[in-house]
Structures are given as C-alpha cells and as structure tokens.
C-alpha cells in the first residue's frame, strides 16, 4: 500500500465520518434511529451507491465491528447502575438465555420454510438474528424516561444476551462444517458453561484487577481513559481466546468500573462517550459498505416475511415465555419489551462467521441478517416513541441540570459541578440564598448574571436567567433538580401521577373517610403500604399503578427502593357526575 492509497483512505474515511455526523440531526427530524443514518451512508458509499466503493473484506469488517462493539459495551456497562439489578436481573437473564433460544428456534423454523433450508441451516439463521443489540438499544433508549423495570430489563438483556447467540451460532457452524462434530447434550452443556462461565469469571476478575490498577497508579489525567479502554479490550480478547464470551466479559468489566469508586471515573466516561459515537459510526459505515443492496432485492419478499415473523411472532412468544415467572410485569410491559427487541450490529457480525468458515449459503445468511436488521431499525426503532405511549411505560421527564461535570479533587471523588439556568416559574426567584432548602453538604459555588460572575453570599437574591454552579454529588441530583431545573408542566404530572398525593404510611380508614370509599373491617385496619404490597409486590417502581375501588393508585415517589408516596387519579368529571346521579 503506497502513500497515495493511504492518503486516499484517510480522506474517504474522514469524509464518510463527517457526513454521518452532519446528517445525525436528520434522524430526529424524520423519527428514525440514528444508527440507520450511519448504515445508509455506508450503503450509499458502497459499490451499488454513488461512492462506488467495492468493499468485501470480511475479516477487516469483523475486526472493526468487534473493536467497536467492545467499546460500546464497556461504555454501556459503566453507565448501568447495579441498583437496577434489583428489579431487572433475573428477568434479563431469562430473556438473555431462554428468550434467545426460543427466538432462535421459532425464527429458524420460519427461515427453513421460507428459503428451503435444512433444519440446522434454518436454526443457524435464527441464531444469527436471535439476540437484541446493545448498540441499538443503548442508543435508542438513551435519554428516555422509561419505567425502571422495563428500561433496566431491556438494557441488561441487550448487554448479556449476545453470549447465547454466539454460543448457538458457533456450535451450529461447527456441526454444519464438520460431520464429525457430536451434537450431544454434554457437548452443548460444556460449550454453554464455557461461554458464560469463562466470560463472567474473566469479566469480574479482570474488571477488579483493572479497577485496582487505575486506582493504584498516579498517571496524567488523560491516560486513565486509555488504561480503562486498553484493559477492557485485553479482557475482551483474552476471554474470546479461552473460549468464553468477550462480549459478556467487557460488559461486566464496565459494570464493575462504573459502580465502584474509580479514579477519574467522570473523565473516563467523557472520553468513552466520544469513542462510543465514533465506534457506532465506524461500525455501521463498514457494515453498510460490506453489503450489496442489489443482492438484498433478490430476497426482499421472503426476507421481509422473515423479519415480520420474528418481530410479530417469535420475539413476543419468547418474551412471554421468558417473563412468565415474573408476575411484576404487566401485559403492557411485556408487549413493549417484545417490541423493543432491536437488532443491530451483532447479527451482521455473527453473519460474518459462516462467510469466514466457508459454509454453503453463507452469502444468503449475511444478506438475511442485514435485511432483518434494516427492517428492525426502521419498524421497531422508528415507532419506539409511539410504542412507549401506547404501552404507558414512559414517565414524565425528570428535571435535569443543563450540564454536569466531574470534579476530581481526590482520586475517587464523587463530586460534580451541576449547572442550572433559572426560569421564571421557579419559586426561588427573588429569594436570598440563605432561604434555599439545599441538600446537606451541597453548596452554590458561583452565580452568573448577564455573563458576569457574582460572588454569592447568603444575602444574594436570585433573578430569572441566573446561571447557578452547584457543588454536589449524584445522590443530591434529584433534590437539586427539583429546586432549580425547568420542571415538566404540572398538568402532565397530574395526568400521570394523579391529582393528589398520599403518604405511604397513611391509614386506609383515613383515606376512605377522605374520599368516601366503602371499606370492609379488615381493610380499614390496614395502611396504604399494605395495599401497595398486595397489588404490586415487594419491588414496585415509579409509575406502577393499580385499580382499586374505581380509582387509580400510582407509585409517585420511590426512595432507596421503598415507596414513599402514592398518587391518586380521580375519574374524569363526567364519570363523577354520573356516579352522583
């Protein structure tokens, strides 16, 4: 490769990345996933597009995709709170194992019928497209106010279900590639334990060693993120080399780093944010270049039937079977989890395996995987907002600061600087700072007014448009945001959480007298928390509700996984009038 070729490679690569970045706002305007934009740019630059770039180097595509996926999962793991495992761990594990297996089998049977394949070949197609994609799920759910049980389940499932798909794909390729491979129960069990066991062990052990190294060594600030990424990639590669799941390993590594007091954690996350965007762009550009759109047209109708069958038939059945033991999930939540079974880069990466193994029909598998991913991103990704509304799993947006920055004043500092812009509707306008009910240990470090820095004191009165810089920790975020952020409209909050709020310790007898409810003797002696336990179980989340005595009772506040307030939704005025008559 000469200097001119290398320079051309840099120019074309930079141009495609720049175009992808500049076109990213188009996704929100058109209501389509941003990943689809990156994929489309790659396809337009390919051999059937205006770029006429002929790219069919599957090993390079495999390398780029795995590198990108590893970085995305490291970032996703660091941003996942272990606390969410309380409500989502076992449902996620069930979906990541049993759910993937059921989806694989049902999709495989459909593929066998549609494309005249053998049973094993059809199930291989099902295994390739059987898992949800972490890059797609993390990207599309980012910034969404979802019911925590649903949101955490989807994110943890997407970060942990790839090992099952890899296990099934690799096993089936081994069987199809060699008649001597013994597909016995012992072989399958050993392969399964190796994928998950080695992956989990190396992820946790390697993650702990990496965390120790980061905290132990005094390095320039910019090197901690490089150490975190290089260490994560080493764990990813070592796990793969030992027959484990590198995908699971690096996700668990990120989970450990993000949930322990890690030196320069905020700086690492800031760097990872940019690297994750670059990884997503690069991965989908390369995968877009790899496909030949004219070949997709040859399988368009049966490919569409396969994708629709998986979305409307295989995935919902798998979700309902996988979540059957978990009574806390409502039918609406199960349907939403079914719908957000987004496919992305992972199925396309898995479809490269048969190409590299030289299996018959390998090109068909690849084209099918690509087609299914495109349909999934367009149909499921494009209707995500509508699905959230129909399933009623979306919460009112939480008040947030306009910016937040980590303050690394000591190695494992949890301090952050939160920036707030005061709006006219805030009660603190005109109040001196000494009158604010600030969380204990927090402090307003600076106030900016008309682009001028003020030195705040207890007598400083706040004005509309002031910008406040507040020193605090993440645990203080909710209280501070209630004080200073632009809050959602009261009408929308009332529609969601109810017209009145009741303390969880309130006696049902008092509630009955207040709202004219007819209670039996046993109910009259109970408290509101007993009613919540009876209807919602031990781990309700914000936004859960139940019907009782013709009223809707909504979980309106949760602190440390304990319900503290219940919202009461009254029937519409017309129903109240009819009842009075």
UniProtKB/Swiss-Prot annotation:
It is a multi-pass membrane protein. GO terms for cellular component: plasma membrane. InterPro entries: Cation/H_exchanger_TM, FAD-bd_PCMH-like_sf, Na+/solute_symporter_sf, NhaP2, RCK_C, RCK_C_sf, Transptr-assoc_dom. PROSITE patterns: RCK_C. It is found in: Cell inner membrane. GO terms for molecular function: flavin adenine dinucleotide binding; potassium:proton antiporter activity. Residues 405-486 form the RCK C-terminal domain. The keyword Membrane applies. Pfam families: CorC_HlyC, Na_H_Exchanger, TrkA_C. The keyword Coiled coil does not apply. It comes from the Bacteria. Its main location: membrane. GO terms for biological process: cell volume homeostasis; intracellular potassium ion homeostasis. It catalyses: K(+)(in) + H(+)(out) = K(+)(out) + H(+)(in). Keywords: Antiport, Cell inner membrane, Cell membrane, Ion transport, Membrane, Potassium, Potassium transport, Transmembrane, Transmembrane helix, Transport. The chain crosses the membrane at residues 3-23, 30-50, 58-78, 87-107, 109-129, 192-212, 232-252, 271-291, 304-324, 335-355, 364-384. NCBIfam families: PRK05326.1-1, PRK05326.1-2, PRK05326.1-3. K(+)/H(+) antiporter that extrudes potassium in exchange for external protons and maintains the internal concentration of potassium under toxic levels. Belongs to the monovalent cation:proton antiporter 1 (CPA1) transporter (TC 2.A.36) family. NhaP2 subfamily. This is K(+)/H(+) antiporter NhaP2. It comes from Vibrio cholerae serotype O1 (strain ATCC 39315 / El Tor Inaba N16961). The lineage of its organism: Bacteria, Pseudomonadati, Pseudomonadota, Gammaproteobacteria, Vibrionales.
């Amino acid at each position: 490769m000469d200097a001119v070729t290398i320079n051309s490679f840099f120019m074309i690569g930079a141009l495609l990345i720049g175009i992808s970045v500049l076109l990213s706002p188009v996704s929100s305007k058109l209501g389509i996933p941003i990943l689809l934009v990156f994929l489309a740019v790659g396809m337009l630059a390919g051999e059937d597009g205006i770029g006429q770039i002929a790219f069919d180097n599957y090993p390079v595509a495999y390398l780029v995709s795995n590198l990108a996926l590893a970085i995305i999962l490291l970032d996703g793991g660091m941003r996942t709170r272990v606390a969410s495992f309380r409500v989502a761990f076992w449902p996620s594990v069930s979906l990541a194992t049993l759910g993937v297996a059921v989806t694989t089998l049902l999709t495989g049977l459909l593929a066998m019928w549609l494309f005249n394949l053998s049973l094993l070949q059809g199930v291989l197609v099902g295994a390739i497209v059987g898992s949800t994609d972490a890059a797609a799920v993390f990207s599309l759910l980012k910034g969404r106010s979802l019911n925590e049980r649903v949101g955490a389940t989807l994110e943890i499932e997407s970060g942990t279900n790839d090992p099952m798909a890899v296990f099934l794909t690799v096993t089936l390729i081994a069987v199809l590639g060699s008649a001597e491979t013994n597909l016995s129960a012992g072989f399958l069990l050993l392969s399964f334990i190796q994928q998950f066991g080695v992956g989990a062990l190396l992820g946790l052990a390697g993650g702990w060693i990496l965390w120790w190294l980061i905290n132990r060594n005094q390095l320039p600030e910019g090197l901690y993120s490089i150490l975190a990424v290089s260490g994560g990639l080493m764990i990813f590669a070592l796990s793969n080399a030992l027959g484990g799941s590198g995908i699971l390993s690096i996700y668990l590594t990120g989970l450990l780093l993000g949930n322990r007091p890690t030196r320069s954690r905020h700086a690492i996350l800031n760097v990872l944010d940019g690297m994750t965007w670059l990884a997503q762009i690069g991965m989908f550009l390369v995968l877009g270049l790899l496909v030949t759109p004219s070949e997709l047209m040859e399988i368009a109708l049966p490919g569409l039937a396969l994708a629709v069958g998986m979305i409307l038939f295989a995935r919902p059945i798998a979700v309902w079977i996988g979540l059957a033991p978990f009574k806390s999930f409502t039918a609406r939540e199960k349907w939403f989890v079914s719908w957000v079974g987004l496919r992305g880069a992972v199925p396309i990466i898995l479809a490269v395996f048969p190409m590299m193994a030289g299996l018959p029909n390998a090109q068909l598998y690849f084209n099918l995987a690509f087609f299914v991913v495109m349909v999934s991103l367009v149909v499921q990704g494009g209707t995500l907002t509508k699905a959230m509304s129909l399933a009623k799993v979306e919460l009112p947006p939480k008040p947030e600061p306009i910016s937040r920055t980590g303050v690394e004043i000591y190695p494992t500092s949890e301090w952050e600087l939160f920036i707030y812009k005061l709006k006219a509707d805030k009660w603190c306008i005109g109040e001196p700072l000494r009158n604010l009910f600030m969380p204990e240990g927090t402090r307003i470090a600076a106030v900016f007014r008309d682009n001028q820095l003020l030195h705040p004191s207890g007598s400083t009165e706040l004005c509309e448009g002031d910008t406040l810089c507040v020193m605090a920790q993440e645990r203080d975020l909710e209280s501070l945001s209630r004080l200073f952020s632009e809050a959602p409209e009261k009408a929308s909050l009332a529609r969601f959480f109810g017209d009145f709020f009741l303390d969880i310790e309130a006696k049902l007898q008092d509630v009955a007298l207040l709202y004219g409810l007819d209670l039996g003797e046993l109910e009259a002696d109970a408290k509101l928390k007993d009613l919540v336990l009876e209807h919602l179980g031990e781990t309700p989340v914000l936004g859960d509700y139940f019907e009782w005595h013709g009223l809707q009772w909504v979980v309106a506040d949760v602190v440390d996984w304990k319900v503290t307030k219940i919202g009461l939704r009254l029937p519409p005025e017309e129903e109240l009038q009819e009842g009075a008559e």
